[in-house]
Amino acid sequence: MNAGPIQSATELPWLLQPMAGVRAALAGGRPPHSLLVTGLPGAGLKVFADWLIALYHCSDTARAPCGVCKSCAWNARGSHPDHYPLTPVENSKEIRIDQVRELLNQLAMTGHGGRQRSALVFPAERLNRSAANSFLKMLEEPPAGSLLVLATAAPSRLPATVRSRCLTIDLPLPAPAVSAQWLSARCGGTPESWQRVLSVTGNCPTNVCESELAAALQQTGELEADAIALAAGEREPLLLAKQWDDDRYDSRLVGLENLITKYLLQSAGTSRPHLLSAADMPKLRAMFEVLDRVRDDRLLAETPVNRRHGLTVLLTAAQAAFRSAGFAPSRDQ
C-alpha cells in the first residue's frame, strides 16, 4: 500500500508539539520577520514550512490554517499571489543572486488586496555565496508586512550571519520505533519490516513513506549485499561505482553511511571490547575516515564534480578499510 505524498504537517504526529509552540508564540504578539526551520532529513521540513506559510496567510485567525478560506485554497494549489517560493533554478543546483533580487522586487510591491506577503527558501543551503549575501541584506532590513522562511537540513552550510538574523525552529525526529509504527499505519506492512528498512536508510520516515514496502525492502537488501560483497572482495569498486551512479546515488550513500555508523557504534559497545584495543585503533580510524568520505561525497554531489570518479575513490578506500576492520554487515540487522 502506497499512501501517496504527505499533504499536511498535521499528518506527522511528531510535529504537533512544534506546531503548538508556533501557535502560542503568534498568540503572544507580532510574528517574527524571518524564521529558520531546521531538522534532519525525513523530519518533514518542507511540509512544516508550507504549514507556516498557510498559517501566516489564513484569514481565519482562530482556526488557522483553516483549509477552507481563499488564502488556504490558494496555498493548497501552490498559487498564492502573495507567496514567493525560492528554489534552485531549473538545471542548476544553486539559488542565485538574480533570484534573490527578483524576490526583493516582488516583496517591495503591495500585496494582493493589501495582504501580507511571504517567501520560502528551500532548500536554503543551496543559496550560493552571492545570493546569501544579498539575502542577508533583506534579513537586516525586511520588507514591511512580509515573512521570510528558510528551511534546511544543513544549517551549518548557511552563513552564520544569515542564521543569526532568524528565529530558529528545530524539528524533532521520532524514535525509530515510532517511525516504524507510523509507516506501518500509513503504508501497510509490519513495524518490524519498516524498522529493517530504517536501519539502513536512517530514521527518515518522510523520505521512505512514498515507497512500497516490498521495493524498500528489496533496495535495503541490495545495498547490504553490495556492502558485504565489497568487504569480501567479491565486487570491484570501479564496477560498483558504475552501478551506484544512478538516480539512487544519494540514498545509496545514506545507506552506506548508516551501515558504517551502526558498525562503529556496535564496535564501541561492551559486546566487542577487543576492537577498542590499541592494536585495532588504526582499523577503526580508517573506518571513521571512510565515514567522513561518504559525507563529503554527499555534499560534492551538489557540485559539478565527476561523480563516478568520486564514487570509485570512495569505494576503493571503503574496501580497504572494510577488509582491515573485518567489517561484515549482517543481512538480518
Task: Please give the residue ranges for each predicted region.
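Charged, glycine-rich active-site and insertion segments that engage polyanionic ligands
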Residues: 1-55, 63, 71-74, 144-146, ...
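Conserved alpha-helical scaffold flanking the Walker A/P-loop in AAA+ ATPase domains
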Residues: 21-26, 94-118, 125-126, 130-138
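Short loop/turn elements that form and flank the Walker-type P-loop nucleotide-binding site
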Residues: 30-31, 76-80, 112-115, 142-145
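AAA+/P-loop NTPase substrate/partner-engagement loops
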Residues: 62-95, 156
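ATP/adenylate-binding site constellation spanning eukaryotic-like Ser/Thr protein kinases
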Residues: 80, 100, 132, 163, ...
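Localized chelating/binding microdomains
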Residues: 86-91, 108, 117, 170-174, ...
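Structural recognition of the conserved hydrophobic beta-strand(s) that form the central parallel beta-sheet
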Residues: 119-123, 135, 146-152
